[in-house]
Design a protein with these regions (language model features):
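Noncatalytic nucleic-acid binding interfaces
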Residues: 448
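A short, conserved beta-strand element in the Rossmann-like catalytic core
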Residues: 117-118, 428
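A residue-level structural signature of the nucleotidyltransferase/glycosyltransferase Rossmann-like core
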Residues: 109, 190, 197-198, 270, ...
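Catalytic metal- and UDP-sugar-binding loop of GT-A-like glycosyltransferases, i.e.
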Residues: 9, 112, 406, 451
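Left-handed beta-helix
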Residues: 2-3, 203-405, 410-429, 436, ...
Length: 477
């Protein structure tokens, strides 16, 4: 069996699992079920002797989160492709296919989202082996999930004949149904949930684009050929990329192709499309209550109660069918049956221009992360975490001075011409306008508290003189 290259799609806005999932830090990077994040689990289940190193397709904002989370689980990516902007799944999958085809014209790809869970990894890998067999014959293979209940939130796959595990020809894609039709399809054995997972030879999906979407093939090919290597990331060319159609792989290719097969499988799959799904997939007590470490439930039934901040204790009393998720800057309380309306709430917050709609409390950067602890008109306090060996840019500020207090590790601090080491419980003052840099010279993470004073504290008040991450003026961090 030839090694298969995993293609992991890592985009999305994450609004359905707000406030824990947001545009700046969507659900795939969050440990919603277990200790690993959804992205880490997605990468882990596509490892082993039958798989090559994964190719990740993501955007510029997530690139360092991707590398950090892969490092945490010891997985080396074969490549990380950076989309200049989101154009849905068709251009993303095509870019990865062309990238792999240039390396190996016989490449076989398995394409998977980064934000799903699959509990039975062995069953999933057996399904991949079944798909591999028919992909060698030129089939484009999709994976169908055996429904466990009538579901209106998923698209469906109609089979040409009933099958339990063997690949069979696909008869039709079915749009998300109403409840009446969902019940009918659940009772039939000919319909499966559309998982959004695919397996095919790179040459076959490229040929499909050549036949059904040649303009996208031309644009993505140019974008890849005109890409640049940016700190090891393959940054696709924007000018060519925006010429692609913003369209899913289902609409662009799959619904038009005549060489489609489906492999059915049951492996504890969920796309975690709402807080009700998160509740279902986590272990609950005898009353159906799932709580985090900082949450207490008294006389509650069928409820999810989570605190995502060590300083916030959440107590639920007499709750039934309720979702409660508390974070430092936002709290969600919702009826379990209305979990899909969370997205509407996020839209309202956006209209109100509330930063909580899209911005995660922790702001991730190539060197680590920071979070704002408090902010006022004349000051802001941040907690800053710097990875071992990492450094911030050499920079200055026009509107603020800074005071750094190291609370863990050692900081190498440059202020104008002076370089000094600041140890735990020591501090240093950065005058307004001073050219400065912070670096972690140690082998362990370094953390400090930063107190800013001045008249403006925006992340665009940064003038860079030197930056190892090649960020321009006004770029964040």
């Amino acid at each position: 069996m030839q090694q298969i290259t995993p293609i992991i799609l890592c985009g999305g806005s994450g609004s359905r699992l707000w406030p824990l999932s947001r545009k700046s830090y969507p659900k795939q990077f969050v440990p919603l079920v277990g200790n690993k994040t959804l992205f880490q689990n997605s990468a882990t289940r596509l490892t082993g002797k039958q798989f090559k190193n994964p190719v990740i397709v993501t955007n510029s904002d997530y690139r360092f989160i991707v590398t950090e989370q892969l490092q945490e689980i010891g997985i080396d990516p074969g490549a990380i492709l950076i989309e200049p902007e989101g154009r849905n799944t068709a251009p993303a999958i095509l870019a990865a296919a062309l990238f792999e085809y240039q390396i190996n014209p016989d490449a076989i790809l398995v394409v998977a989202p980064s934000d799903h869970i699959i509990k039975d990894v062995d069953a999933f890998q057996l399904a991949i082996e079944e798909a591999y067999k028919v992909a060698l014959d030129g089939q484009l293979v999709t994976f169908g999930i055996k429904p466990t209940h009538p579901e209106t939130g998923f698209g469906y796959l109609e089979l040409s004949k009933i099958s339990t595990a063997q690949a069979v020809p696909l008869k039709a894609f079915v749009e998300k149904p109403n409840l009446t039709n969902a019940k009918k399809m659940f009772q039939s054995e000919n319909f499966l949930w559309n998982s959004g997972i695919f397996l095919f030879q790179a040459r076959d999906i490229i040929e499909a684009f050549k036949k059904y979407s040649p303009s996208d093939l031309d644009a993505v090919n140019l974008s890849l050929n005109n890409s640049i290597n940016d700190l090891g990331f393959c940054r696709l060319n924007l000018t060519d990329w925006v010429k692609t159609e913003n369209i899913s792989i289902d609409y662009a290719i799959m619904e038009k192709s005549d060489n489609l097969s489906v492999v059915p499988f049951s492996a504890g799959w969920s796309d975690l499309g709402g807080w009700d799904a998160v509740w279902r997939e986590n272990v609950s007590n005898a009353n159906g209550v799932n709580t985090s470490n900082n949450a207490t439930a008294i006389g509650c039934e069928n409820s999810l109660i989570r605190s995502e901040d060590d300083s916030i204790e959440v107590v639920g009393i007499g709750l039934k069918n309720i979702i409660t998720v508390a974070m430092k800057d936002a709290v969600l309380v919702a009826d379990m049956s209305k979990s899909q309306d969370v997205k509407k709430a996020v839209d309202i917050l956006k209209e109100k221009k509330a930063s909580q709609a899209t911005q995660f409390p922790k702001d991730h950067r190539p060197w680590g992360w920071f979070e704002s602890l408090t902010i006022d008109e004349k000051f802001q306090v941040k907690k800053i975490h710097v990875h071992p060996g990492a450094s911030l840019s050499l920079q200055s500020h026009k509107y603020r001075a800074e005071h750094w207090i190291v609370v863990s590790g050692v900081a190498e601090v440059t202020i104008d011409e002076e370089v000094k080491l600041i140890s735990e419980n020591q501090s240093v003052y950065i005058p307004l306008g001073a050219i400065h840099r912070m670096r972690n010279p140690g082998e362990n993470p370094m953390e400090l508290i930063e107190v800013q004073t001045g008249t403006y504290f925006g992340e665009d008040d940064i003038f860079r003189y030197d930056d190892v991450y090649s960020r321009g003026q006004g770029a964040k961090g």
